[in-house]
Regions:
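Cytosolic regulatory regions built on CNB/CRP/Popeye-like sensor folds
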Residues: 1-163
C-alpha cells in the first residue's frame, strides 16, 4: 500500500479527493528494479499500470524488419505513467520497458483501478482524461519517428541511380 500523499503528487492522481487517493493507494505498491531489468515485454499480459518515482526507463517496440528494438521513449520525470495497457482495454503490453538505471516505481493493479473508476465516474473521467493526454504525447513521438523513417527512406530511394 502506498501512502495517499505520494499518489497526490503524481500526474494521474494529483488533486483527486482524499477518499479517491485512499482507495487507489489500497491497491498500489512500490517496486524496485535494478538497471538493465526488463519490467515488461509485449508477450506479457498487462495487469498493472506503472508510475515512475526515481530513475530512468526506456520504452521500446519491436519491428520484424529490424534486428534491434526501436526506442520510442525514455522516461526520467517522477510521476510519468507507463505500461497502461491494463486500463485502456488491452490484455497485453504493446511495448517493452527496461530500467536504464536502478528505478523505483509505483505499481497500480489495473483491474482494481478500473473497477474503482467505474464506481466513481467523476474520478474516472479525470484520471482517464489525464491518461489520454499521456497517450496523445506518446502518439506524437511515434508519429515523429514514423515521419523521420519515411523521409530517410525517400531520400535513400531518390538517390538510387537506375542506369
Amino acid at each position: 500500500m502506498i501512502a495517499k500523499e505520494i499518489l497526490a503528487g503524481l500526474e494521474l492522481f494529483e488533486g483527486l479527493p482524499d477518499d479517491a487517493q485512499s482507495a487507489i493507494s489500497a491497491f498500489s505498491k512500490e517496486l524496485s528494479f535494478a538497471a538493465k531489468t526488463t519490467i515488461f515485454s509485449p508477450e506479457q499480459s498487462s495487469k498493472q499500470i506503472f508510475l515512475l518515482m526515481q530513475g530512468s526507463i526506456r520504452l521500446t517496440i519491436f519491428a520484424s524488419s529490424l534486428s534491434e528494438p526501436v526506442t520510442v521513449g525514455v522516461l526520467k520525470t517522477p510521476g510519468q505513467a507507463f505500461g497502461f495497457s491494463s486500463v485502456v482495454g488491452q490484455g497485453y503490453y504493446n511495448s517493452s520497458a527496461e530500467a536504464l538505471t536502478d528505478v523505483r516505481v509505483i505499481s497500480v493493479e489495473g483491474r482494481s483501478l478500473m473497477d474503482y473508476l467505474d464506481k466513481e465516474p467523476a474520478v474516472g473521467y479525470t484520471v482517464m482524461k489525464r491518461l489520454a493526454h499521456v497517450i496523445s504525447r506518446r502518439l506524437g513521438v511515434m508519429r515523429r519517428l514514423l515521419l523521420e523513417t519515411i523521409i530517410d527512406y525517400e531520400r535513400q530511394a531518390s538517390s538510387i541511380d537506375e542506369n
